[in-house]
Amino acid sequence: MADKTFNLQIISPTRVFFDGDAEMVEMKTTEGEIGVLAGHIPLTVILEPGILRIKQADGKKEAALHDGFVKITKSKVTILAESCEWPDEIDINRAEEAKMRAERRLKSGGKSVDVMRAELALKKALTRIDIAGRYK
């Protein structure tokens, strides 16, 4: 029988966020949600802010993943992320403030507003609020 696990590495500019065996990992890509099991076809995909789900033999973990890309091979998944946070690392008050700032920038609609940047900031804030709220 084929191995049911693969090595999962999640690396951000500031740390190795996760390095261990996983049975499955789910994440949000620019094309939608993707779930990866051992033996997946090789693939490289761009990631969007969203909830990262890791299934291991001893349970499940979730984290807020903010941009990056994933390289998938049959026996290893490597995620290079702008940032990644466990729920207990998120300051929900700061995330709420970031959400309000992004919404204000988008509503102002002035020429100086970088809409793509404001939308990205809003997505990140909503992801942080969502996952932190689940683990209160």
Describe each region flagged by the PLM.
Residues 86-136:
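Acidic/glycine-rich phosphate/pyrophosphate-binding loops and surrounding catalytic core
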Residues 7-101:
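Compact, glycine-rich, soluble single-domain proteins
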Residues 1-5:
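Short, charged, intrinsically disordered terminal tails
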